Amino acid sequence: MYAYIKGTLTELNPTHVVVEASGVGYEIQTPNSYRFQKYMDHEVVVHTSLIVREDAQLLYGFINQEEKDMFLSLIKVTGIGPKSALAILASSSPNDVKIAIENENDAYLTKFPGIGKKTARQIVLDLKGKVQINDVDSSQILNTDTQDHANAPIIKEALLALEALGYSKRELTKVEKSLSKETFDSVDDAVKRGLQLLIA
């Protein structure tokens, strides 16, 4: 119904963003809302997908079309709902997920919250050969670049975002120690690093 929404980014929360367009504020669930941080109070285009349930109409949003397409592919897999698909895309780029699928790397897929061996195998069975990998070496899963020292407010926001993705306080306590030894320019960077540590 909504291919994308173009408007002003007015709110940034661990699980969603709010975009105001034509006087209406759209609450949009995102894999990692802090990817939109640089657009705060500025115009942004969010690629969206509306999912209607018996009890709710939920709008999901993505930083680009590739991320949206990967989300739509994932939720077609038996056992994968929107929440699990968002958790996967919060923890990894669409291309890394595609590479894991094509390489039948079940171990990589089971590192995401809520994805067990059976579901990981189902993802591979359903999507292998149906996803387009970008021009990279498909024998490797790419890692996100990280930085070096700590910033408490950023780390605090990042931990809230990770908790919203379904990670336990016990897991986050371990990650917090590692994050505190590094520094980050943005919450997005800290979230990405935290996700790397959690799925390592």
UniProtKB/Swiss-Prot annotation:
GO biological process, one term: DNA recombination
GO cellular component: cytoplasm; Holliday junction helicase complex; Holliday junction resolvase complex
Record-linked Pfam families: HHH_5 (PF14520), RuvA_C (PF07499), RuvA_N (PF01330)
Region (Domain II): 64-142
Main location: cytoplasm
Sequence segments annotated as region (Domain I): 1-63
GO molecular function: ATP binding; four-way junction DNA binding; four-way junction helicase activity
Keywords: Cytoplasm, DNA damage, DNA recombination, DNA repair, DNA-binding
Entry keyword annotation includes DNA-binding: yes
Protein localization: Cytoplasm
Signal peptide: none
Disulfide bonds: none
Residue ranges of the region described as Domain III: 150-200
Region named Flexible linker: 143-149
The keyword DNA-binding belongs to this UniProt entry's keyword annotation: yes
Family: Belongs to the RuvA family.
Subunit-structure text: Homotetramer. Forms an RuvA(8)-RuvB(12)-Holliday junction (HJ) complex. HJ DNA is sandwiched between 2 RuvA tetramers; dsDNA enters through RuvA and exits via RuvB. An RuvB hexamer assembles on each DNA strand where it exits the tetramer. Each RuvB hexamer is contacted by two RuvA subunits (via domain III) on 2 adjacent RuvB subunits; this complex drives branch migration. In the full resolvosome a probable DNA-RuvA(4)-RuvB(12)-RuvC(2) complex forms which resolves the HJ.
Domain notes: Has three domains with a flexible linker between the domains II and III and assumes an 'L' shape. Domain III is highly mobile and contacts RuvB.
Described function: The RuvA-RuvB-RuvC complex processes Holliday junction (HJ) DNA during genetic recombination and DNA repair, while the RuvA-RuvB complex plays an important role in the rescue of blocked DNA replication forks via replication fork reversal (RFR). RuvA specifically binds to HJ cruciform DNA, conferring on it an open structure. The RuvB hexamer acts as an ATP-dependent pump, pulling dsDNA into and through the RuvAB complex. HJ branch migration allows RuvC to scan DNA until it finds its consensus sequence, where it cleaves and resolves the cruciform DNA.
Protein name: Holliday junction branch migration complex subunit RuvA
Native organism: Staphylococcus saprophyticus subsp. saprophyticus (strain ATCC 15305 / DSM 20229 / NCIMB 8711 / NCTC 7292 / S-41)
Gene field: ruvA
